[in-house]
Swiss-Prot record:
Named cofactor requirement(s): K(+)
Alphabetical list of Pfam families matching this protein: MMR_HSR1, MnmE_helical, TrmE_N
Family recorded in the similarity comment: Belongs to the TRAFAC class TrmE-Era-EngA-EngB-Septin-like GTPase superfamily. TrmE GTPase family.
Cofactor note: Binds 1 potassium ion per subunit.
Name listed for the protein in its UniProt record: tRNA modification GTPase MnmE
Length: 459
């Protein structure tokens, strides 16, 4: 597939030690040679080398910058095209000047995600691997980055390709049955083979889907909302979990007037912690906005940490808050155990039933370990599975796998009911196509464009 040559800045904008301008395409080396002055022309250097020299404006012969240029020749590159990377000092003015020179002499500004898109279109990676590149960039924990790296390396792709190959083998048998309907033994053998292989594929899809909940948590983080009356210690809890002081902690009720969010790795579980404004009736306009945002965060939460004050009796406000969350995955935390106990624990247990309860003192940092273990146990049964497993974490992949499972179940039901093989063939083909959408072998151009448009510029 023929493309033009693209260019972009591949490092974050701003002052830094190093800035990189990347070019990819058939004229990458030629454009580089128009700007580069060194011991050798770039066209004469070996592939996968880095070369010292200067960028010079060809129009004025002005030395723009001292650089190191990497030369990477196709096909042993990420895009499977010629690539050069111009490494310069990280000043905004200089790196923009070099970018402008590359465009003046034949390159086009790359679109977001275009390098990865070219890697996909040139067969370097499939669509699920391309999506994993962005997951890796966005990962918030070591575990999430490991899951993404496994997918970049092709673990999910290999599984999907094997399943599609198995379906093709079933379809080949079905074709024999359709072509030679007069042979009963062929029909019997085909039906037996179809059912055996289809059930095996369905079981494999089910195993992948079983990793979906954990995979999605690792990819996106477990959305965890801390809720309770004002001044029960919600922000102190957030600070203890993230070991930071982002939330404002004071003795004034209603201090947290917005939703504060932070990522933290708790016992291998990535949490997206959300500290909310206390939910209560208020006339303060600013606080009222915070309360509404808190209600929205609650409705979207995977886990709710409901905080009570050990120093105060249970109130109607506490009961009202618990009514809002009682049907959700929640942990009740009795905080401030370092203070005099005025809270009736039996009354709390009667209200919350089987909901887990942890007692803590955020001031003395007591009970935090128990809280972390309870979070892990609630969602992972006490066992955060091996990060080397193949996880499905992408919502698009999960949706397609569910559709594929339904389609192959339709094929199984049809075969068991004695429906003609040409009808069964339709469901099998549909399963094959749905699995192909995951790795991009049967994805539409519109879907591909939409997915890559979400990437950052320069990747």
């Amino acid at each position: 597939m023929d493309f033009d040559t693209i260019t972009s800045i591949s490092t974050p904008m701003g002052e830094g030690a190093i800035g990189i301008v990347r070019l990819s395409g058939p004229q990458a080396v030629e454009i580089g040679d128009k700007l580069y002055k060194g011991k050798k022309k770039l066209e004469d250097v070996d592939s996968h080398t880095i070369n010292y020299g200067h960028i010079v404006d060809p129009e004025t012969n002005e030395v723009v910058e001292e650089v190191m240029i990497s030369v990477l020749r196709a096909p042993r590159t990420f895009t499977r095209e010629d690539i050069i990377e111009i490494n310069c000092h990280g000043g905004i003015l200089t790196i923009n000047r070099i970018l402008e020179l590359t465009m003046t002499h034949g390159a086009r500004m790359a679109e977001p995600g275009e390098y990865t898109k070219r890697a996909f279109l040139n067969g370097r990676i499939d669509l699920s691997q391309a999506e994993a590149v962005m997951d890796f960039i966005r990962s918030k924990t070591d575990r999430a980055s490991k899951v993404a790296m496994n997918q970049i390396e092709g673990r999910l792709s290999d599984l999907i390709k094997r399943q599609r190959q198995s379906i093709l083998e079933i379809l080949a048998q079905v074709e024999v049955n359709i072509d030679y309907p007069e042979y009963d033994d062929v029909e019997d053998a085909t039906t037996e083979f179809l059912l055996e292989q289809s059930k095996k594929i369905k079981n494999e899809i089910n195993l992948l889907l079983e990793t979906g909940a954990q995979g999605k948590i690792m990819r996106e983080g477990l959305s965890t909302v801390i809720v309770g009356k004002p001044n029960v210690g919600k922000s102190s809890m957030l600070n203890n979990l993230i070991q930071d002081n982002k939330a404002i902690v004071t003795e004034v009720a209603g201090t947290t007037r917005d939703v504060l969010e932070e990522y933290v790795n708790v016992r291998g579980v990535p949490l997206r912690l959300v500290d909310t404004a206390g939910i209560r009736d208020t006339e303060d306009i600013v606080e009222k906005i915070g309360v509404e945002r808190s209600r929205k965060a609650l409705s979207e939460a995977d886990l709710i940490l409901f905080v009570l004050n050990n120093n105060e009796p249970l109130t109607q406000e506490d009961r009202t808050l618990y009514e809002v969350i009682k049907n959700e995955d929640a942990i009740v935390i009795v905080n401030k155990t370092d203070l005099e106990q005025n809270l009736d624990i039996n009354e709390v247990k009667e209200m919350i039933g089987d909901t887990p309860l942890i007692q803590t003192s955020m001031l003395k940092q007591e009970g935090i370990d128990q809280l972390e273990l309870q979070i892990r146990d609630l969602f992972f049964g006490g066992d955060v599975q091996n990060q080397d497993m193949t996880y499905v974490s992408n919502s698009r992949h999960i949706s397609l796998l569910k559709q594929a499972r339904n389609a192959i179940q339709d094929a199984i039901d049809a075969a068991e009911s004695g429906i003609p093989m040409d009808m069964v063939q339709i469901d099998l083909t549909r399963t094959w196509e749905l699995l192909g959408e995951i790795i991009g072998e049967s994805a539409s151009d519109e879907l591909i464009d939409q997915l890559f448009s979400q990437f950052c510029l320069g990747k």
